[in-house]
């Protein structure tokens, strides 16, 4: 029932009267509110538009306005803006280009608000109060400001200018009037509200369709609608569209680079399309968008009436275009529309290409090639009419969805204002007044402060003094537009040259950062009071203009740190201290704050800020000074530079807090100390009189990783103590000029830092990684590694910065720290695939073409054949005693219940059918069949998991760091070269030929069965799921009571399988050339080869370890995919192939939807990928000694040792979904490690006699007509048994009684029942060898 119908259901007159009375009260309140914000009468056409945007109006109002609807939109956005302004009227707001009378729409009284207006056009002096009009742009001294319907006339430079002149300004709100349809020069989308007039370089916005109150816009003003961020020098401003109503928009601007949407949309009343340009010259085509509904109607008309004439088309256009809309089309537009649809009517719409339904297998294979040749022919000779029609119908959707822009304003460019106001505002806006706030007692001859400060602590948190004075704004001299600032011989830092030369800098040239801004070697200067102290160190500090000043610690910060120490949430040594010591520390932090002398030395890394202090200590070793360091690495560096001092002079920060000896302390790199530590130390050090802090506020701060700590909520130390720094040395000796300038630092160091980009991890570099977990794992794999933040104090000639999914989470200071470590070379190693347009590629990737390579086959180079050594004489034959076969079978048959007690049951499909025949022995083997529907659905439920491409992508990104660890472990295990392996096209095509040859070697019926997956209409990422038909013969599954889920087979698009099968085979060939001898992969190897390897490499005196995984295929998630990506990139596989593989794994489609990331049988590289992931995981998890024999095949592995788990890997175990099933063998008779159904024994690689006997019994009990009966499999089983059979008496050295019995029964079955020739020939050869050896 609709809401309107509810009232009709009420029949009681009194109840209806009550409802109407309540409605009347609401209407009165609404009309009262509407009278305040929208009192005007709205024309009927405009009312629907207002209702669409939820703007109320009074239908009975008689008050008129020339553009009432447009005015309603303006006021509505004012009210919306008031929600983002301070809620209390006592907090001032600056209103720019706004009349004071409009404050009522913001619900403000205005007694504390400020107005900034300009005299731009003649009427401004009449509408703005004189005391609010400025001839220049003054500083905004409030935190919030508002610009009303004016910002759209200015460029982005004006916005930068407002923020750069107003350091206190935090939020700027602005309303703008810009119709988005003007991008396409369309008619007004809301003609009842406004109309548009277009000219060559400008357009007019006419509210209400009337002249007199119009806005004139340049077309570039529309760029405000796509504004995202703007960067100018050190200032970045982010804008967000808060609300849009028709052509009126409310934007909010803030400092900093914040998150913005990629796209911004605007309302489109109906879908519009832009017709393609089918005539030349281009001007004789339809230029403006038209409604898509009309375009489709006109198309269907001209195709339905037969031979359409020009008159027919004219008549249809006249019939379907409403009288009110005829004026929207110009005569030439109508002519072009008529000719366009006449052309569509004359073109043939019958498909000119061949259909494929009746194709034979041969035609189906060659059809794509024929179609491609036809397409090329038509491009050269001309298209058919059907192709012309399809091209003429490629209309462009006009949806008013635009990509949000990031832009940078040009360096030294004046604010581009409109020409009619440019001359008026040029003096006030394009010239910035230069001033600096001074504080405290002057230092005498201290050089003048620099205005180029760019330090976090140098804003509004400076200590105040009674002598502070307010500086009035003075208009600066006029600057001419579009002229470069003249270069002067005198430098802004000339007064500081003495200090700079003392640090080793000539500072005689200008250097610029990447944005073109001048880099000053001295920043953030302050005038602070001097407080002399009785120590010889004072003269040194005075000489370098670093005199100390008085300081009292913030005890709240000290107490916060003490609470975390007591709770064991910070520190390592402090956690172990007794409760009494912690209580004492907490008590001291609550005492009256001590007053000490404090000197803060700020400077870039390598600037020499600590040089004067170290020189003083070197020349005055008798002066007791204690140096406190945040890390052991930094402590070792100080000890190396000052070897004459006692080692206790240099202490880590925790030891110093435990034993604060002396009165003078230096804290180096103090920003790396825990927040609140310095204050707590001051309170805890009884004799402390002078504290010197050195550090770089641009580098990483300390961050406590323990959960629920309090100190991370405190302000960084650089913010607290930065106000006590007299200047910042923004120059370095460490980094050459190109790297330093890129970081915004001055440098005179010769040479250049080479910056490289790679996708492969190089060795021989100091690795910088974003996380502690990754650092520990890199270190455990023999890589020298530090975190981005933890590398502070390290200087290395060559640095490799590992970029992964954690890198974007790092702060600017952390990245600055990492980038400033190198002196000669920086390698940026990206371990992530390119994700910029991943989802677009998923949607837009075309079908992979099924094309056979009809080129000459190139045979892959194989290993040289080795000559077989001479055979040893066969041992004498031995007759085994006859055993009872029933004893072997009883253990399997006796515990088995009835069939239906073992089968899987489903309410919809009934029982499965895996337990077959009445033979109790055959019932011990589960027979899984593809036609078993119950088993199929049980298998799908257990083996497959549905997901979405977005969830898969999230999974992939989340587990990338795990994949990096796997790749490093695999690379180390397989002894791959450090540099990427150059791609070999000849080997690639040879592998492709092998894959193709293998596929074509299938019988014809198998090729016909796959015809659906060979068709180009089968999606490249689609797959069909089948249940594998098989007898379950794994030794641990034989005789299992409950029926288990089966195995799935995934059938992909055949060209997809061949492409990635080629990739896997190519990497296999490369792998074989580097694979160490102690590792064997059971691929393309026979029993004889493996036995020979076992004899040469396996030590049976050591314990052995084997492992299998539970649900191995389903467990290969995003971590394994990242590992495969890195492996493929290291093999230099073409990027388009790697990206296609990632897209396939993240967006594999089946009947249930998208599959989660997992391994699928039949996807191409299944075996190779399974094996290599097994190797990577095993070597990442365990410490495997060098030269230990190892065997791998898929998810099976065998190691000739008892591996020890890496401690660094323990936190990662739960992050993997892999679940191991390890076994340890002592290697003795009857207990040998099993690998792929065989036993690794001192006599070679032999078939497990128990499994062989069980399988033979199953084959013997089948009917001769059934597949897999004894006559079908006897020869194959005999070949498996032959190596064991040939050992003779040596079997007693390896088999126990149970295994010997099983071996005897197998031999007896094959010779007496199957009459196999293999064992009879072997027996004859043994007898001949025995005869000849006796002679």
Curated annotation (Swiss-Prot):
EC code(s) of this entry: 2.7.7.48, 3.6.4.13
Domain (+)RNA virus helicase ATP-binding span(s) in chain numbering: 564-729
Coiled coil residues, start to end: none
GO terms classed as biological process: DNA-templated transcription; mRNA modification; RNA processing; viral RNA genome replication
Database matches in CDD domains: Alphaflexiviridae_RdRp, SF1_C_RecD
Keyword Zinc-finger: no
GO molecular function: ATP binding; ATP hydrolysis activity; mRNA methyltransferase activity; RNA binding; RNA helicase activity; RNA-directed RNA polymerase activity
Domain of life: Viruses
Keywords of this entry: ATP-binding, Helicase, Hydrolase, Multifunctional enzyme, Nucleotide-binding, Nucleotidyltransferase, RNA-directed RNA polymerase, Transferase, Viral RNA replication
Feature: compositional bias, Low complexity: 453-466
Residues holding ATP: 603-610
Alphavirus-like MT domain sequence ranges: 58-225
Reaction catalysed by this enzyme: RNA(n) + a ribonucleoside 5'-triphosphate = RNA(n+1) + diphosphate; ATP + H2O = ADP + phosphate + H(+)
Transferase recorded as keyword: yes
Segments for region (Disordered): 428-492
InterPro entries recorded: (+)RNA_virus_helicase_core_dom, Alphavirus-like_MT_dom, DNA/RNA_pol_sf, P-loop_NTPase, RNA-dep_RNA_pol_alsuvir, RNA-dir_pol_PSvirus
Domain RdRp catalytic: 1102-1209
Residue ranges of every copy of the (+)RNA virus helicase C-terminal domain listed in the record: 730-863
Protein function: RNA replication. The central part of this protein possibly functions as an ATP-binding helicase.
UniProt family annotation: Belongs to the potexviruses/carlaviruses RNA replication protein family.
Name listed for the protein in its UniProt record: RNA replication protein
Organismal lineage: Viruses, Riboviria, Orthornavirae, Kitrinoviricota, Alsuviricetes
């Amino acid at each position: 029932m609709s809401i309107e119908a509810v009232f009709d259901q009420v029949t009681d007159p009194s109840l209806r009267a009550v409802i109407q009375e309540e409605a009347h009260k609401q209407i009165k309140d609404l009309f009262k509110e509407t009278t305040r914000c929208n009192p005007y009468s709205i024309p009927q056409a405009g009312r629907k538009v207002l209702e669409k945007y939820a703007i109320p109006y009074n239908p009975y109002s008689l008050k008129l306005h020339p553009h009432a609807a447009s005015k309603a939109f303006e006021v509505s956005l004012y009210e919306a803006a008031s929600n983002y302004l301070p809620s209390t009227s006592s907090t001032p707001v600056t209103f720019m280009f706004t009349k004071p009378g409009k404050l009522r729409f913001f619900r403000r009284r205005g007694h504390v608000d400020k107005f900034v207006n300009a005299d731009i056009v003649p009427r401004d002096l009449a509408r703005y109060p004189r005391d609010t009009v400025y001839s220049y742009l003054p500083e905004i001294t409030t935190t919030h400001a508002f610009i009303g319907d004016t910002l759209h006339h200015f460029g982005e430079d004006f916005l930068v200018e407002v923020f750069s002149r107003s350091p206190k300004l935090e939020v700027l709100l602005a309303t703008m009037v810009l119709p988005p349809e003007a991008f396409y020069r369309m008619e007004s989308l809301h003609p009842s509200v406004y109309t548009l007039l277009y000219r060559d370089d400008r357009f007019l916005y006419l509210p209400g369709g009337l002249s007199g109150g119009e806005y004139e816009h340049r077309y570039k003003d529309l760029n405000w609608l796509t504004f995202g961020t703007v960067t100018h020098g050190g200032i970045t401003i982010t804008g967000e569209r808060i609300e849009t109503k028709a052509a009126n928009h409310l934007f909010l601007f803030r400092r900093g680079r914040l998150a913005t949407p990629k796209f911004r949309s605007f309302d489109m009343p109906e879908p519009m399309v832009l017709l393609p340009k089918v005539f030349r010259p281009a001007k004789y085509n339809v230029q403006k968008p038209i409604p898509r509904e009309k375009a489709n109607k006109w198309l269907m008309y001209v195709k339905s009436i037969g031979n359409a004439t020009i008159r027919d088309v004219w008549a249809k256009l006249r019939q379907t275009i409403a009288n009110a809309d005829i004026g929207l089309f110009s005569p030439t537009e109508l002519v072009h529309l008529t000719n366009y649809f006449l052309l569509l009517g004359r073109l043939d719409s019958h498909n000119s290409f061949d259909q494929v339904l009746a194709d034979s297998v041969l035609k189906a294979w060659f059809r794509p090639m024929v179609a491609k040749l036809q397409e090329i022919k038509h491009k050269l000779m001309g298209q058919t009419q059907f192709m012309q029609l399809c091209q003429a119908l490629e209309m462009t959707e006009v949806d008013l969805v635009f990509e949000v822009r990031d832009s940078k304003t040009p360096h030294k460019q004046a604010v581009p204002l409109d020409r009619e106001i440019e001359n008026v505002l040029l003096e006030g806006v394009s010239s910035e007044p230069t001033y600096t706030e001074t504080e405290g007692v002057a230092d005498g001859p201290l050089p003048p402060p620099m205005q180029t400060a760019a330090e976090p602590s140098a804003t509004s948190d400076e200590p105040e003094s009674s002598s502070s004075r307010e500086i009035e704004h003075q208009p600066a001299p006029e600057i001419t537009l579009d002229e470069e600032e003249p270069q002067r011989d005198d430098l802004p830092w000339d007064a500081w040259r003495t200090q700079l030369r003392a640090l080793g800098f000539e500072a005689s040239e200008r250097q610029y950062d990447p944005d073109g801004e001048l880099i000053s070697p001295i920043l953030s200067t302050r005038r602070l009071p001097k407080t002399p102290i009785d120590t010889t160190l004072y003269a040194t500090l005075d000489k370098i203009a670093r005199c100390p000043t008085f300081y009292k610690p913030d005890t709240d910060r000290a107490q916060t740190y003490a609470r975390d120490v007591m709770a064991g949430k910070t520190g390592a040594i402090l956690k172990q201290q007794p409760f009494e010591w912690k209580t004492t520390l907490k008590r001291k932090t609550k005492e009256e704050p001590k007053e000490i002398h404090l000197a803060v030395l700020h400077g870039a890394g390598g600037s020499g800020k600590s040089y004067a202090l170290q020189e003083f200590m070197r020349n005055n070793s008798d002066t007791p000074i204690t140096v406190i360091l945040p890390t052991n690495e930094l402590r070792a560096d100080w000890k190396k530079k000052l070897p004459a001092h006692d080692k206790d002079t240099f202490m880590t920060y925790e030891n110093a807090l435990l034993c604060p000896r002396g009165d003078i302390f230096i804290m180096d790199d103090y920003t790396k100390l825990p927040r609140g530590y310095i204050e707590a130390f001051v309170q805890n050090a009884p004799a402390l009189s002078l504290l010197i802090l050195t550090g770089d506020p641009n580098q990483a701060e300390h961050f406590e990783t323990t959960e629920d700590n309090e100190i991370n909520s405190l302000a960084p130390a650089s913010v607290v103590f930065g106000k006590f720094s007299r200047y910042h040395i923004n120059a370095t000796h460490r980094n050459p000029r190109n790297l330093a300038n890129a970081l915004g630092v001055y440098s005179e160091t010769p040479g250049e830092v080479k910056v490289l980009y790679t996708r492969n991890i190089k060795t021989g570099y100091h690795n910088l990684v974003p996380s502690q977990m990754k650092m520990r794992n890199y270190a455990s794999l023999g890589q020298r590694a530090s975190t981005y933040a933890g590398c502070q104090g390290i200087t290395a000639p060559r640095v490799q910065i590992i970029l992964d999914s954690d890198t974007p989470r790092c702060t600017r200071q952390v990245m600055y720290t990492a980038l400033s470590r190198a002196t000669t070379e920086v390698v940026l190693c990206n371990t992530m695939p390119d994700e910029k347009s991943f989802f677009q590629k998923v949607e837009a990737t075309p079908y992979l073409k099924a094309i056979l390579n009809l080129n000459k086959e190139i045979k892959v180079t194989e290993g040289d054949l080795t000559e077989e050594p001479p055979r040893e004489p066969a041992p004498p034959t031995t007759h085994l005693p006859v055993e009872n076969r029933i004893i072997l079978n009883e253990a399997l048959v006796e515990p088995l219940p009835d069939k239906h007690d073992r089968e899987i049951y489903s309410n919809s499909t009934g029982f499965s059918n895996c337990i077959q025949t009445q033979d109790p022995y055959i019932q011990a083997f589960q027979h899984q069949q593809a036609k078993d529907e119950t088993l199929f659905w049980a298998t799908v439920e257990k083996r497959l998991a549905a997901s979405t491409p977005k969830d898969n992508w999230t999974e992939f990104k989340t587990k990338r760091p795990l994949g990096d660890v796997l790749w490093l472990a695999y690379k180390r295990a397989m002894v791959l070269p450090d540099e990427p392996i150059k791609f070999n096209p000849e080997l690639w095509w040879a592998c492709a030929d092998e894959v193709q040859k293998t596929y074509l070697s299938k019988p014809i019926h198998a090729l016909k069965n796959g015809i659906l997956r060979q068709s180009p209409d089968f999606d490249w990422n689609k797959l069909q799921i089948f249940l594998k038909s098989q007898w379950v013969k794994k030794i641990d599954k034989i005789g299992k009571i409950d029926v288990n889920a089966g195995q799935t087979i995934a059938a992909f698009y055949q060209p997809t399988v061949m492409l990635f099968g080629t990739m896997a085979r190519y990497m296999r060939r490369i792998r074989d050339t580097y694979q160490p001898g102690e590792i064997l992969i059971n691929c393309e190897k026979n029993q004889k080869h493996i036995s020979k390897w076992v004899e040469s490499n396996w030590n049976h005196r050591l314990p052995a370890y084997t492992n299998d995984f539970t649900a191995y295929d389903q467990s290969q998630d995003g971590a394994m995919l990242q590992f495969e990506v890195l492996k493929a990139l290291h093999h230099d596989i073409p990027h388009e192939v790697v990206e296609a593989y990632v897209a396939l794994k993240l967006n594999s489609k089946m009947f249930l939807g998208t599959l989660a990331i997992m391994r699928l049988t039949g996807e191409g590289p299944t075996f190779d990928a399974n094996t290599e992931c097994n190797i990577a995981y095993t070597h990442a998890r365990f410490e495997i000694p060098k030269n230990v024999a190892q065997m791998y095949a898929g998810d099976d592995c065998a190691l000739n040792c008892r591996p020890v788990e890496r401690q660094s890997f323990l936190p990662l175990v739960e992050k993997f979904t892999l679940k191991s099933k390890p076994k340890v063998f002592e290697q003795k008779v009857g207990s040998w490690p099993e690998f792929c159904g065989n036993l690794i024994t001192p006599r070679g690689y032999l078939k497990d006699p128990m499994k062989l006997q069980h399988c033979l019994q199953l084959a013997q009990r089948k009917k001769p007509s059934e597949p897999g009966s004894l006559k079908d499999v006897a020869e194959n089983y005999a070949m498996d048994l032959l190596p064991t059979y040939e050992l003779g008496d040596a079997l007693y050295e390896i088999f126990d009684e149970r295994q010997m019995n099983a071996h005897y029964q197998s031999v007896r079955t094959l010779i007496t029942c199957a009459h196999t020739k293999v064992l009879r020939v072997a027996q004859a050869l043994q007898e001949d060898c025995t005869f000849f050896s006796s002679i």
